[in-house]
Amino acid sequence: EFKRNDKKDLASNPRALRRLRTACERAKRTLSSSSQASIEIDSLFEGIDFYTNITRARFEELCADLFRSTMDPVEKALRVAKMDKAQVHDIVLVGGSTRIPKVQKLLSDFFSGKELNKSINPDEAVAYGAAVQAAILSGDKSEAVQDLLLLDVAPLSLGIETAGGVMTALIKRNTTIPTKTSQTFTTYSDNQPGVLIQVYEGERAMTKDNNLLGKFELSGIPPAPRGVPQIEVTFDIDANGILNVSAQDKSTGKQNKITITNDKGRLSKDEIERMVQEAEKYKADDEAQKDRIAAKNALESYAFNMKQTIEDEKLKDKISEF
C-alpha cells in the first residue's frame, strides 16, 4: 500500500521494515478484540508518514492460507496418535496467536463445534505444563498433580537389520516409553558361529536408508543347521530415552548387549521430521522392495528345506528306486 500510494519501495531499508512490522504486529493483536485497527507510523521512509486502517475481515482474507495451514499439525497429531477427533476431551489453546478469532473458529469447526478451553493463559500454557511435570518428577503427591501423567514416546521406530538388509522394528514409532520388548531370531547359514546385531532408528523398510545407532556381535553359537539356533533380542528403553539392546542364545545362555544414549548418534528434531517425510514419500517403493526380499528369503528357505529332505538317509533309497 505504501509503495502503491507514495511510489516508494522501502524493501531495502531494514529500519523502516522493522518499524512497519512492529506496527503490524500491534494491529494484529488489536484485531483479536476489535473489528478494526489503525496503523500509524510517523516518518516511515524518506520523511513520509504512513497511516492506514485494517479491518478484521481484511486481515482474515490476507492470512487465509496461513490460518488454514494451522490445521495441518492438528490433523497430523491425531493421525500419529491414531485418534479420532471425537475422542478429544478438551482443546487447550497454546501460544499468543491462538487468541486470533479466526484460528479459534477454525479449531472449533474442526472439532465439530466443540467449545475451546480458555481457562489457561495461552502465553503461560507451556510454563504451566513444565511446572506440573517438574512437580511430578520432584515427587509432589498433592491432589493437584496426582491424576496427571505426561507420557513420552519413541520419535522413530527402533529395530535391527535382518536378512537382505531389511529393517525389522521391535519398537514402533510413537510407542509410549518406557517400554521393553523381545523377539526371537535365528541364523541364516549352517553352522553360523555368531550373529551381528546392528541397531537402527528410522521408518524406511531397508536399513541402508535408516540411521545406524550401534552394533555388537554375539559369538559362540554352537554349530547347527540354519534356522535352528534361537537368539532372543531384547530392546529396553527407559523414561530418559536410553536404549539397552541385548541378544541371548537360548541354548547356551550366552549374551551380549549395548547401551545407546540420547547423545550417541541420535537424530535431531529436524532430521527426524525429514526421515518421517521420506518414509511417506517412498512408502510404495519400500513395500515393493521388502516384498521382493521376503520372496527371495522364502525361496531360499524352501530350497534349503528341499535339499535337507533329499539328503535325508531314510528317503535316499526311495528316491533312487523312483
Swiss-Prot record:
Name recorded for this polypeptide: Heat shock 70 kDa protein
Lineage top rank: taxon: Eukaryota
UniProt KW keywords: ATP-binding, Nucleotide-binding, Stress response
Any single GO BP term: response to stress
Taxonomic classification: Eukaryota, Metazoa, Ecdysozoa, Nematoda, Chromadorea
PANTHER family: HEAT SHOCK PROTEIN 70KDA
Keyword set includes Nucleotide-binding: yes
Signal peptide from the UniProt entry: none
Organism: Onchocerca volvulus
InterPro entries, per database record: ATPase_NBD, Heat_shock_70_CS, HSP70_C_sf, HSP70_peptide-bd_sf, Hsp_70_fam
Family: Belongs to the heat shock protein 70 family.
Pfam families hit by this protein: HSP70
Cross-referenced PROSITE patterns: HSP70_3
ATP-binding among keywords: yes
GO molecular function, one term: ATP-dependent protein folding chaperone
More about this protein: Heat shock protein 70 is a major immunogen in a microfilaremic individuals from a filariasis-endemic area.
